[in-house]
A protein has these predicted regions:
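N-terminal secretory signal peptides and thylakoid transit peptides that target proteins
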Residues: 1-15
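An N-cap/entry alpha-helix motif that binds or orients negatively charged groups
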Residues: 27-107, 202, 211-243
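Alpha/beta enzyme core
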Residues: 177-285
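Hydrophobic faces of well-ordered beta-strands that scaffold small-molecule active sites
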Residues: 111-114, 141-143, 162-164, 190, ...
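Acidic (Asp/Glu)-rich catalytic clusters
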Residues: 152-159, 274
Length: 285
């Protein structure tokens, strides 16, 4: 019975099983148990199931949602399941080096922590806890404009410079002030998000929001994002739909940070990023 229980748990976590939630529920019914303690989690798929149980519906929806019917999320899972590791034998694996050097950043791990906003909604340590974990495991970190914690405090917690993810508002003077603040905090690169030209139809978030009977004002009232402190954001939009490739040159005129374009989806845009002087790109999936 012990081996059968272990087998079912590992099977539930397989990335080949794209409909994880339904399968996890079936396994839980078979085992007659449900994970309730994060210390019992052994993989990220179980963590997602536990998070759904522990996190308020609206907050879980914000974290888990895709766009429309979440088809892209499903396509991501399907796509990764088609990757296969090609093992090569009888090579010296006694000293394996996974370190990378990206735009002057030397990291022990090739896995970068991409920006996730509003982490204070999920843990009291918010981005400070993430920064400490990144430092402990040798991961580089990109901090969101929408972070719950200031870039200065996160940089101090990590003990090393981070990269800053930027939403260029429709007020250029605010964008310049955010760039200057990030650079003053020690950020070596700024990652300009370009794949959010307008509002998204986040069906999963909307659906779970309706199931949440809490008053959102209880935890959101008067909580301006730290990156917007000192800025006049009255009536401003988080993103500027009028941006063109010229923004790369404009940014380089006001900052010495590397300018990385985040949200590239087609090869033609990758070529344009190079043409207009971007120092790097982050491909959106």
């Amino acid at each position: 019975m012990t081996h059968r229980r272990q087998f079912l748990k590992y099977l539930a976590a397989s990335p080949l099983l794209t409909n994880y939630s339904a399968f996890a529920q079936e396994v839980e019914e078979t085992l007659g148990e449900r994970l309730t303690d994060p210390r019992d989690v052994i993989n990220v798929f179980e963590m997602e199931a536990l998070a759904r149980e522990r996190i308020p519906p609206a907050h879980f929806g914000y974290l888990a949602t895709g766009v429309d019917s979440d088809e892209t999320l499903q396509a991501n899972r399907d796509g990764f399941s088609r990757f296969q590791i090609k093992p090569r034998r009888l090579v010296d694996a006694s000293e394996v080096d996974t370190s990378v050097n990206v735009l002057g950043v030397l990291a022990d791990s090739p896995i970068f922590l991409c920006p996730v906003g509003s982490q204070g909604a999920y843990h009291s340590d918010a981005e400070l806890g993430t920064a400490r974990a990144a430092a402990a495991k040798g991961h580089h970190m990109i901090l969101s404009t929408q972070s719950s914690t200031s870039i200065e405090d996160v940089t101090e917690a990590r003990g090393a410079p981070i990269w800053h993810q930027l939403y260029s508002t429709d007020r250029w003077d605010n964008t310049v002030l955010m760039l200057q603040r990030a650079e003053a905090a020690g950020a070596t690169s700024v990652c300009l998000t370009i794949d959010l030209p307008g509002r998204r139809n986040t069906e999963t978030q909307s659906r779970l929001f309706r199931k949440d009977d809490r008053n959102c004002l209880d935890c959101h009232r008067g909580q301006a994002k730290p990156m917007f402190e000192g800025l006049d954001m009255r009536g401003a939009r988080l993103t500027d739909p009028s941006l063109t490739w010229d923004v790369i040159g404009r940014m380089k005129q006001v900052t010495d940070m590397n300018v990385i374009i985040k949200g590239i989806e087609v090869a033609e845009d990758a070529a344009s990023a190079v043409e207009y002087g971007a120092d790097g790109i982050i491909v959106s999936n």
